[in-house]
Regions:
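Alpha-helical adaptor scaffolds
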Residues: 146-217
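Canonical tetratricopeptide repeat
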Residues: 82, 121, 155, 159, ...
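Helix-start (N-cap) detector for alpha-helical repeat units in TPR-like alpha-solenoids
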Residues: 42, 77, 111, 116, ...
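N-terminal leader/linker segments that initiate helical-solenoid repeat arrays
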Residues: 2, 14-82, 270-280
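Residue-level recognition of tetratricopeptide repeat
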Residues: 49-50, 85, 124, 162, ...
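Helix-turn-helix repeat elements of alpha-solenoid scaffolds
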Residues: 50-65, 89-102, 128-140, 166-170, ...
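Structural marker of alpha-solenoid helical repeat scaffolds
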Residues: 70-72, 106, 110, 145, ...
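Register position in tetratricopeptide repeats
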Residues: 89, 121, 128-129, 162, ...
């Protein structure tokens, strides 16, 4: 039988403290969404830019460049936000960060919700570009703005926690995760990443408690099941780990999480040489 210590973690995207996609559904619903009160022509153009970037980023990039060149003063903010989004789609993280940061800098006064969103986007771009120090500056600036509610603040605190982990500031990250849990208690990702952080900090008791909350909030999330299995096997509960990883393969058989779950299961139950020979 494989012992917990002998299982080599094969990290999945959810288990790594890598930046989330800038416009993943979770991020869009909170701090990095594009908030419109009463939509304007510029708002509609920004939405069209986001949609075009998904299908034809090259054309979207050209259109964004023209829009930025035509605008003046605070009117450049939304064109720059469009440009930042296109750069993010193209994985040009430094350029995306610069565009979002400039969009925040020239934004009109009196729109703190939008400023919070754009600063969050700048922070996520910096984090994706492996600049957690710059990301933290953007997130801290965003948190100084009226955020539109605790859920948005919770998302920013989660992003801030990821930056702090990348900077090796474990105590500060712990505080940021706690703030995210307080402000966004219904967000599964808050609990998932908190559990991962606790597990990596060798606090399996806390990790188990946190992953149970994530599982209750999102029982069919394959990344939650993957992390639950890792926590279980490290705690000596091999049967529970196997059950979690098998469920991941059933729930999302073609996903990256399912591939990782299979690798974990193979470590628990390695193929025997005689069975390999018989399969030839």
């Amino acid at each position: 039988m494989t012992t917990p210590e002998s299982v080599t973690p094969v990290e999945s995207p959810a288990q790594l403290f890598l930046p989330l996609p800038l416009f993943a559904p979770i991020a869009v619903s909170a701090a990095t969404e594009i908030p419109f009160a009463v939509p304007t022509v510029e708002d509609d153009r920004l939405r069209a830019c986001v949609e075009q970037a998904a299908s034809d980023p090259a054309s979207a990039l050209a259109e964004a460049g023209k829009w930025v060149a035509q605008a003046r003063g605070s009117a450049r903010s939304k064109p720059l936000q469009c440009l930042g989004h296109v750069h993010a789609v193209l994985l040009r993280w430094d350029a995306a960060e610069a565009a979002f940061a400039e969009a925040a800098a020239v934004a009109a006064a009196g729109d703190p919700l939008r400023l919070t969103a754009v600063l969050g986007q700048a922070g996520n771009a910096a984090l994706a570009g492996d600049h957690p120090d710059r990301a933290l500056i953007h997130f801290d600036a965003a948190l100084k703005q009226p955020s539109g509610g605790p859920a948005a603040r919770g998302q920013l605190q989660l992003d801030r926690a990821r930056a702090l982990v990348a900077l090796g500031r474990a105590d500060d990250a712990t505080a940021a995760f706690a703030a995210a849990q307080r402000d966004a208690p219904e967000e599964p990702l808050v609990w998932l990443l908190s559990a991962t952080f606790a597990r990596r900090s060798n606090d399996l008791t806390a990790a188990q408690r946190l992953i149970e909350v994530a599982s209750n909030l999102s029982p069919i999330d394959p990344d939650v099941g993957l992390e639950a299995g890792v926590i279980a096997v490290l705690g000596g509960r091999e049967a529970a780990a196997r059950q979690s990883w098998q469920s991941v393969r059933r729930i999302a058989p073609t996903s990256k999480a399912a591939e990782t779950a299979r690798a974990y299961l193979d470590q628990l139950d390695p193929p025997r040489p005689d069975s390999a020979e018989s399969g030839r």
